[in-house]
Amino acid sequence: MAYEIILGREEAEREKFGTLGSVLIGKHYVQMGQTTALAQNIYLDLNRAHVVFVCGKRGSGKSYCMGVIAEGIATLPEEQRSRLAVVLLDTMGIFWTMKYPNHKDEHLLQQWNMEGKGIPVKIFTPTGFFKKYKQEGIPTDVPFSIRPYELTPEDWNLTFDLNPNEPLAIFIARIVLTLQKQRDDYDVEDIVEAIQADAREEEHLKNAALNRFRSVEAWGVFSREATPLKDLIKGGQVSILDLSPYAVMPGGWKIKHLVIGLVAERLFIERMIVRKNEEFKSIHSAIHYLITEEEEEEERLRGKEMPIVWLMIDEAHEFLPAQGKTAATDALITLLREGRQPGIAMVMATQQPGKIHTDAMTQSDVVLAHRLTAKVDTDAMGSIIQSYLRGTLDKELTLLPRVAGSCIAVDDVNERMYPMQIRPRFSWHGGGAPKIVEEKKKALEF
C-alpha cells in the first residue's frame, strides 16, 4: 500500500487514524530521471483546526484550491461532516457555481476515478440585493444582514476612512456611544435621527455625517433582525457569503471589510463559549466513568449547534494588508493567533503574498504555494519556508510542471515539503477567465 501523505497531521495520529477525518486534495509529484509523474495521494487533515495559506499569481489555481477543500468537507461521511461547517467569503461571486456538476472536465475527472457532481451549498446574499437576485434568476438562498448595534465607533471610522482624531470621527463616535448607552438596539435610521437631533455640533459636520450614513442605507446589509449565526454555521453545511454586489460599488472593499470583520468576531466569541462547554464535558467524562445515553445525545446535539468552523477568505491581502489596517484586521489576526484553541480553522488565498500581513504567513501550518513570478512575492514566501528549501523558492517553483494547480505544499506540522498537483474539482468552477474563442461541441454521428 502506498504511503499516504496527510498535510497537518502528526505521525502518531496518521498511524492511529489513517486518512479518517481528512480530505483528498491532490497527488505528489515525483521525479524519475527526466520524467515528472504523479504518485501517492495527498490529503489535508481536518481533525484539528489549521491555518492554510494559498498563494500564487493570477490564474494559478488559488480559488480552485479553496473549492477543492470545501468540496472535500461537504462530501465527508455524515458522522464527520456534521461536526464541521464551512463559511466561504466570496468577494467576486464565483463560488455559487458549486451547486452544479463539473461536466467540462469529465475526461480529467475520469483519470482521477471521479465524476462530476454538484454540492448543496447555501448562498447568503445581503438583504438589500436578495429580492433583486431572485427576480433576475441569480442563484441565492437566504438573505444576510448584520445589526448596526454591533459596530464600534472604530468600525465606522475605518469604513468611512476617517482619522479617529479628526472632528467628524469624534462626532460619529459620540453619537454611536450615546446610542449604545441609551438603547439595547438601533438601526441606521436611528443614527441618522440622532445626528439630526444633536444640538452641540456644527452644521457642516452634521451634514458630513448624514451624507455618510445615508449612503450606508444603500448598502443593503444592515437590519435590526440580523442573520443568526446558527443559520450561517451549521454542521455539514457549506455557507457562501456572497459579497460580490459590492464589487462595483464606491468604497465596496470597505463594506466587505466591515462585514467580514464582524462575522469573524462573532465566530470567535461563539466558539469560545462552546469550547468551554466542550472542555467541561471532557473533564466531566474523565472524572465520571459512567455517562448516561441522555448526556451523550445532549453532547452530540450541542456539537451540531456550533461545529468546528472552516473560514475561507479569497483575496486575503485586501483584509489583512501588510501596511495599515481595515475593519477586518483585528478580528482576523485574533483568529490567526488564537483561533486554533476554540476550533476555528482558516483558509486564506492571495495573489500578492508580499502585500499581506506577516501573521497570515507565519501563523500558517500548511502552505500551498502556486507559481509566483513577482520578486516581492517570492521573497515574502521564501522568507517563511526557506528552511524547507534545497535552493531558492524561484528554483523550486520553476521545477513544477507548467499546469494550473501545480504547487509546493509545505507541512509545518511535520516540517516537510512536497511538490504536488491539486485534484480536479467535481463541482463547477466559476473563477475561470472569459475567452473569445470557444470550443465547439461535435455533433453526434449515427
Residue ranges, per PLM feature:
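Conserved ATP-driven motor cores of ASCE-family P-loop NTPases powering translocation/secretion/packaging/pilus
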Residues: 7, 71, 335-418
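P-loop NTPase motor domains
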Residues: 48-49, 68-334, 399-413
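Conserved beta-strand position immediately N-terminal to the Walker
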Residues: 52, 239, 347
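Alpha-helix N-cap/helix-initiation motif
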Residues: 55, 59-62, 66, 249-257, ...
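Flexible loop/turn segments at secondary-structure boundaries
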Residues: 61-62, 94-96, 130-131, 248-250, ...
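Conserved P-loop NTPase motor module
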Residues: 402-446
